[in-house]
Amino acid sequence: MKWKKLSLETTTEAVDLVCDMLLSLGIEGIEVVDKVPITEEEKKRMFIDILPELGEDDGIATINFYLENEEDLPSLKVSIQEGLDELRDFVEVGSGKLSLSETEDKDWINNWKEFFKPFRVDDTIVIKPTWEKLEERKETDLVIEIDPGTAFGTGAHETTKLCILNIKKYMQPGATLLDVGCGSGILTIIGRKLGAKTAVAIDIDENAVSASKENCDVNQLEAVLCQSSDSSTRTEGRIELFDGNVIEDRGLRERIGLNSYDFVVANILADIIIPLSAVVGEFMKPGAYFISSGIIDMKAEEVKEAILRNGFIIEEITTMGDWTSIVAKKPNK
């Protein structure tokens, strides 16, 4: 099915009022495009390291929205023009130019799946999408099935590969594992498959926690969804999944377990790893490892300094493409 895309040009000053007017006309799914600089608070909510280049703010905003039924278009144009005329008494609405284009209806949530194929992380670890068949398999292969849904973590990204390889290198069988920012659960699953006795995974996104549970089930690993008010039992052979913010919530950290883990992994972003490094040691036993990844190379030194500042010993720094992973150790005391 084809949709009609309408683009309305206005000013950044008037954009909120114009959007309210469009909503009053029954228009939903509004997208605003402008060059207004991103605030520090917005940067935090975006969870990205590299910000888009917006160019100089020209005071112009474009509001995009979509129509399924073209028959509604003539009357809608009239209503929009009338609404703009009313707003002109209060604010500069700009040109009010309305342009029309056509776009195909696509399954944007699932289209990426056609590009996600089975692949090898190394000689023995194979990542396979749940919807794909594995044509070749060696007896020694450890095959992990993943459907990340909308959560991060197919295993294909350099940051995830770095974590997987470091888990394989440093984690001992029988370890207690904590995965902070678990995403799809891929690192938790691989950790358990490589011999972790117990595993706890946490993410600030409830959807990620749900995706992790589903992927644990697919890989025939026992996993339970825990409330943020629950306390971890760290039952042998079981994965416990929490949602919440361990950086800000001291009570949650206590419930997950202090001084309890041999191995902590965090494949997130540099701007989150830095404050995490101040509290992650609370989870760790003396001599435990902290593997961080998701660090863009331009921020690697900043993360390294934060980890050292919080009393860790850096064992190894590995890179892949533009990304860095840091293996750190809590001193034995």
Curated annotation (Swiss-Prot):
Where does the protein end up? Cytoplasm
Output the PANTHER family linked to this UniProt entry: ELECTRON TRANSFER FLAVOPROTEIN BETA SUBUNIT LYSINE METHYLTRANSFERASE
Instruction: Provide an example Pfam family for this protein.
Output: PrmA
Principal localization reads cytoplasm
The record lists its disulfide bonds as none
According to its UniProt entry, the function of this protein is described as: Methylates ribosomal protein L11.
Write out the entry's keywords from A to Z: Cytoplasm, Methyltransferase, S-adenosyl-L-methionine, Transferase
Q: Which InterPro entries match?
A: Ribosomal_L11_MeTrfase_PrmA, Ribosomal_PrmA_MeTrfase, SAM-dependent_MTases_sf
What EC number(s) has UniProt assigned to this enzyme? 2.1.1.-
Name the GO cellular-component terms.
cytoplasm
Question: What domain of life is recorded for the organism?
Answer: Bacteria
Q: Which GO terms describe its molecular function?
A: protein-lysine N-methyltransferase activity
Name of protein: Ribosomal protein L11 methyltransferase
